[in-house]
Design a protein with these regions (language model features):
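N-terminal intrinsically disordered, low-complexity segments enriched in P/E/S/T
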Residues: 1-337
Length: 337
C-alpha cells in the first residue's frame, strides 16, 4: 500500500513546530508569528508579521457560533502585507488586479477567499487585517487562535476570521481572459457552481419580484459619477440558481467567488464571502435600469451591469455584462498550481 502526503496533510505538524518556536522566542522577548506568502507576488516567502509595516489596530465585534465577540487586534492590513511581499504581480490588461484573489489557509486546512478588488484602496478599500496580537490574549504561543489570524472588520459572523493562519496565496483567473468583440449586450449567462444555470435578462430579473435600488457614487476615469440603479442583488440571483457547496465542509461558500465578464472580455472577481448576508453583506447589484439612462435601450452600458456600492472607483462595475460564473476558487487554485 502506498501513501501520498500533501502539504495540507503536513500543515498541523508544521504549525505545531512554529508554535513551539514562538514560545521559545517569546521567552526571549522576541515575537514570532510567521506566515507564508505565496503565489503571484514579487517576493514570495515566509514573513514574520511583527516585523511588517505599517502596524494597524482594529476593534471589531462579530458573531462566533452565534455569540457576539469583541476584541482589538494589531497587525498589518492584507493589502500592505502583500506590498511588503513585493506587491501583486499583474499584466498589462486593464485593471488586472481585479482578476486576482487571496486564499487564506489555517493549520487545519480551513480556507477563505478574498478578492483583491475588495481590499485594493482604489476599489473596495476594506481594511482586512492579518493580526498577530489582540487585547483578549487569543493570539500568541498560548492563545487559542494561534500565532496569527485574519480579521475582517464589518463582517457579521467570523467565518472569514481564519485562525491559526499559516499561508496567504495570491491566485489569478486563468490567462488570457476570454476575448470579446465588445458592444451592447442584451443578456448574460449565470453558470458554474449552480444547480440551475440560466440566461439573465432584465425581464427575468423583474420576474423574480426582488428588485431593489441603490444610489452609488464612484470614479470613472477620475471623474465622480453618481447614479441610482435598480436590479436584483447578486447574492439573491446566485441563491435563486442554487449555489452548489459541500455541506460537509465548514463554511464552504467562503472558498467560492463569482466572475463577472463584459462583452469585451473585461473581468472582475467577487468573493461570495464579500456579499453573503452572514458575512460581508455587501449589496452588490445586477442592475437593469438607472436614472442616468446608461442601461437599457440606447444606453452605452448594455442591458445589465454589475454595481458595487461603496467602491471608490468603478472598475468592478462591469458593464455590458455577458457572464456571471460561480467558481470554487480554492479548487481553481489547485488546478492552476
Amino acid at each position: 500500500m502506498t501513501y501520498q502526503t500533501t502539504i495540507k496533510d503536513l500543515l498541523p505538524y508544521l504549525y505545531n513546530i512554529e508554535t513551539n518556536l514562538a514560545g521559545i522566542f517569546d521567552d526571549c522577548g522576541y515575537q514570532f508569528a510567521p506566515v507564508l506568502i505565496a503565489g503571484q507576488v514579487g517576493d514570495p516567502g515566509i514573513y514574520n508579521l511583527p516585523s511588517t509595516t505599517p502596524v494597524t489596530t482594529e476593534s471589531v465585534t462579530y458573531l462566533a457560533a452565534g455569540v457576539p465577540v469583541s476584541d482589538t487586534y494589531t497587525g498589518t492590513t492584507l493589502w500592505d502585507l502583500l506590498n511588503d511581499a513585493g506587491g501583486v504581480t499583474t499584466t498589462t490588461a486593464k485593471n488586472d488586479i481585479l482578476s486576482k484573489y487571496v486564499i487564506a489557509t489555517g493549520s487545519d486546512g480551513y480556507q477563505a477567499v478574498f478578492s483583491l478588488g475588495e481590499i485594493d484602496p482604489s476599489f473596495g478599500n476594506q481594511p482586512v487585517l492579518v493580526a498577530y496580537s489582540d487585547t483578549a490574549g487569543q493570539l500568541g504561543p498560548n492563545g487559542s487562535d494561534g500565532l496569527a489570524r485574519m480579521v475582517v472588520p464589518g463582517d457579521i459572523a467570523g467565518g472569514r476570521y481564519v485562525s491559526d493562519l499559516v499561508s496567504l496565496k495570491v491566485e489569478s483567473l486563468p490567462e488570457p481572459g476570454p476575448g470579446g468583440a465588445g458592444g451592447i449586450s442584451p443578456q448574460a449567462t449565470l453558470s458554474g457552481a449552480v444547480a440551475d444555470p440560466t440566461i439573465v435578462t432584465p425581464e427575468t430579473l423583474i420576474a423574480l419580484n426582488q428588485s431593489t435600488t441603490e444610489t452609488a457614487t464612484y470614479l470613472a476615469g477620475g471623474t465622480p459619477v453618481t447614479d441610482t440603479y435598480t436590479g436584483v442583488s447578486l447574492w439573491t440571483l446566485i441563491q435563486d440558481a442554487g449555489l452548489l457547496t459541500d455541506p460537509a465542509i465548514k463554511n464552504d461558500l467562503l472558498g467560492f467567488a463569482v466572475v463577472a465578464t463584459g462583452s469585451d472580455g473585461y473581468r472582475a472577481i467577487i468573493s461570495l464571502g464579500e456579499i453573503a448576508p452572514n458575512f460581508g453583506d455587501q449589496p452588490d447589484l445586477v442592475a437593469y435600469s438607472d436614472t442616468g439612462g446608461q442601461l437599457g435601450p440606447g444606453g452605452a452600458d448594455g442591458a445589465l451591469r454589475l454595481i458595487v456600492p461603496g467602491d471608490a472607483a468603478g472598475g468592478r462595475y462591469v458593464s455590458n455584462l455577458v457572464s456571471l460564473q460561480v467558481i470554487d476558487a480554492t479548487a481553481a487554485a489547485h488546478l492552476s498550481s
